[in-house]
């Protein structure tokens, strides 16, 4: 058996077409969704991510603002910029690209963003809303993963066992909560898990999100399982790869996401969805 690919690029195109149509309808009412992206420092990877996000905004008809600052920017200065964007009626979503320089407290900056404009879904208000099942912005990467599951007919995961490898605030924890909300039985594995393979072999859905190559290999996967690879790493040849041993696991799994072309484009797409919904709530 060879797994079917869940094509993140194709699904993203479909969803972005829907976003563009809803954006056009909003513009007819005199509202243009606006996203502000703030980049501090010259991290090369961050510059690529930011460029992709701004282009995606332009493609669907959003108003986007990119603010670039030198790494010497103080925390106080950044907090002041965030507050100014909170008060800007043309901006519906604020994204501060992480990581920030070491002298700036990521958490303090995220908490300074208005929960009404927290389109990354990282604010404690957003995390709390997810926890208790209220309406709030969902973290973009796990939100994209859920859309990928929906695309293969797995919107309701009742009776399914899902294993999340990773417990970060950005992916692992919100991923577990979204799977739980979809009625899955959820196990979260991490560096303190004694026998990872024993857990993953029972799973109908595995989400790998630790940033470590080959954390999931073919012998660890239940035949026919759905494998979602959130990882972004480089192999020995310098090529982009995920957390999953793709070539091996695709021989066992029922569905698998590729890297690149899987979760990555979906993350940006869900950022667009969140920004659009922020504008629609006006």
From Swiss-Prot:
InterPro entries: Aminoacid_DH-like_N_sf, NAD(P)-bd_dom_sf, THF_DH/CycHdrlase, THF_DH/CycHdrlase_cat_dom, THF_DH/CycHdrlase_CS, THF_DH/CycHdrlase_NAD-bd_dom. One of its GO terms (cellular component) is cytosol. Pfam families: THF_DHG_CYH, THF_DHG_CYH_C. Its EC number is 1.5.1.5, 3.5.4.9. SUPFAM superfamilies: Aminoacid dehydrogenase-like, N-terminal domain, NAD(P)-binding Rossmann-fold domains. Homodimer. This is Bifunctional protein FolD.
